[in-house]
Each structure stands twice: as C-alpha cells, then as structure tokens.
C-alpha cells in the first residue's frame, strides 16, 4: 500500500451504499467501518477513493449476502482535487472486494478505476481495464 498524493475528500461515511464493481457475486455493499480511521468524537468514520473499508453485502448471490468483507473504494461521486490541480469525479460510488492484504477476490473490474486507487493498490491496478 502506497500513500496518496492527492487530497481525497472522505465523502462515504458509515452506512453509505456502494456498487460492487467486480465479479464476486455481490451487487450492492454498505460501508460499516473504515480501516485506520482516526477521527473526532461523534464524527462518523468516512472513506474516499483508495481507502480500505469494511462492507456488508446487501444485494447479491445467496452465498455472498450478509457477509462482512474488506473492500477498496475505486470511484466516488464527490469530486476531489489532484496534485496537478485537476478535479475528478465519477458517475457512481463503487468498490471492489479484496482480501485483508489488498488482493482482489474477483477476476475482473467493471468500469473505470481512479488513478489514486490504482497507484495505492497494485492488485487492483492489475485487473483494471480503464484507469482514469
């Protein structure tokens, strides 16, 4: 895992619903915790692009549903600023299910993957067809 160069807006708090962008069998995920989050009292933990979160599978195959799994956020609707000054935003909030070490469980990723997530997680960048 590599550090992020951009200022990522943490726009996906606990309870946020994400699209599962891989072929593991999950369709919709709900954020239940953000790994390594140190926040203030009474503030909801939130994550952004490139962060590892723990999710609960809300929709998908019967084997996948109701499981708590680690995932990496690869897209977010809220725009964020890159180091060169450009602003980036995507059509949806999406994540891919991974192992605790960060290697994806699926064999393909649907849709674009943010450059920040691809740089930080080499396993995700290997499966990404489009890096934006």
Curated annotation (Swiss-Prot):
SMART domains xref list:
Ribosomal_L14 (SM01374)
GO biological process terms, alphabetically, are:
translation
GO CC terms, sorted: cytosolic large ribosomal subunit
SUPFAM superfamilies membership: Ribosomal protein L14
For whether the record's keyword set contains Ribonucleoprotein, the answer is yes
GO MF entries: large ribosomal subunit rRNA binding; structural constituent of ribosome
Q: Is-annotated flag, keyword rRNA-binding?
A: yes
Q: Which controlled-vocabulary keywords does the entry list?
A: Ribonucleoprotein, Ribosomal protein, RNA-binding, rRNA-binding
Q: Which family does it belong to?
A: Belongs to the universal ribosomal protein uL14 family.
SUBUNIT field:
Part of the 50S ribosomal subunit. Forms a cluster with proteins L3 and L24e, part of which may contact the 16S rRNA in 2 intersubunit bridges.
Q: What does this protein do?
A: Binds to 23S rRNA. Forms part of two intersubunit bridges in the 70S ribosome.
Name of the molecule in the record? Large ribosomal subunit protein uL14
Please spell out the taxonomic lineage of the organism that makes this protein: Archaea, Methanobacteriati, Methanobacteriota, Methanomada group, Methanococci
